[in-house]
Amino acid sequence: MHRTSIVEELERHQQDQKADQEPGSVSDASNSALQESSDPRLSTTDNTNTPEINVNDQQQEQQVASGEDTDPPSPRMKTIVKPPPIKVVPPLNFGPVERNLYRSGQPEPISFPFLEKLRLRTILWLAVEDPSDNFLAFADDHEIVVHHLGLVTEGTNPWDQLTESSIVAALQIIMDRDSYPLLVCCGMGRHRTGTIVGCLRRLQGWNLASVSEEYRRYAGSRGGRALIELHIEAFDTSRIIVYPESAPEWCSS
C-alpha cells in the first residue's frame, strides 16, 4: 500500500508538469492577458469617439479670458468708387507767364471749371476770328472783360502777324494791375500769344536767346516762325508807358 501511493503520487506530478508545458493553458492565457494590458499597441479599446483637444484654441481662449492682447485682424483695402466732382483740365498750351498772368489757346467748355479757379478779371483775345459762343457766355457769367485785339482792319491780311498797335494795346493792359488776374489767348496759344509774351519779355529786359527759346517751346514740334521772332526783336519797347503806381506787383519786384 505504501509503494502504491508513492507511485501514484509520482504519476500525478508528471501529469501536472505536462499540463504546464501544453499551449493554451491557463497560465499562458493569463500571461498573454497581462502582456496585452501592458502594451498599448495590443489594446482593443475603441477610441474613435474620444474628442480631440486643440491646444492652440485653449491658449487663445485663455488669452481672451485673461484680457491679454491678441493679434489684430488684417486691415482691408478701401476702394474709392466715387470720382472727383470736378475735372481739372487746363486749356491747350496753358502756362503761367508771371504772377496772376497766364497764356493759353482758346478755352473749351471742359476747361471752364479750371478757369473758375483762376478768378480771371480780363482776357486778351488775339485771334482774327471771334471767340466761341460758349467762351463768351462763360466770360459774361463770370464778369470777365474780353478785349478782342486780333480784329482785321481794311486792307490787312488775316494771316499776317499782329500789328504794332495791337501789341502796344495788349501790353498797356498787361501793365495795369487792375486787369489782373489776366489771360492772354488765341486760337492755339502759339504764335499770336507768343508774340505778346515775347514783346513783354523784351520789356522786362530778357535777352533774345531766352525770348526765342520760350516762343519755340510753345510753338510746338513744327517750330516757330522766323518772321515772328524778327518782329519781337524789332519791337520798340519805348512805346509802352509803365506807371509805377498802377504796375503789377511782379513788375516792381
UniProtKB/Swiss-Prot annotation:
Biased composition (Polar residues): 27-65
InterPro entries per the UniProt record, alphabetical: PFA-DSPs, Prot-tyrosine_phosphatase-like, Siw14-like, TYR_PHOSPHATASE_DUAL_dom
Renumbered residue ranges of the record's region Disordered: 1-84
Keywords: Cytoplasm, Hydrolase, Protein phosphatase, Stress response
Residue ranges, compositional bias (Basic and acidic residues): 1-21
Span of domain Tyrosine-protein phosphatase: 93-249
EC number: 3.1.3.48
Pfam assignment, any one: Y_phosphatase2
Active site: C186
Gene Ontology terms describing biological process: cellular response to oxidative stress
Gene Ontology MF term list: phosphatase activity; protein tyrosine phosphatase activity
Gene Ontology CC: cytoplasm
EC class (word): hydrolase
Keyword check for Hydrolase: yes
Protein location: Cytoplasm
Coiled coil: none
Catalysed reaction equations from the record: O-phospho-L-tyrosyl-[protein] + H2O = L-tyrosyl-[protein] + phosphate
Family note: Belongs to the protein-tyrosine phosphatase family.
Record's function text: Putative tyrosine-protein phosphatase required for protection against superoxide stress.
Official protein name in the record: Putative tyrosine-protein phosphatase OCA1
Underlying gene: OCA1
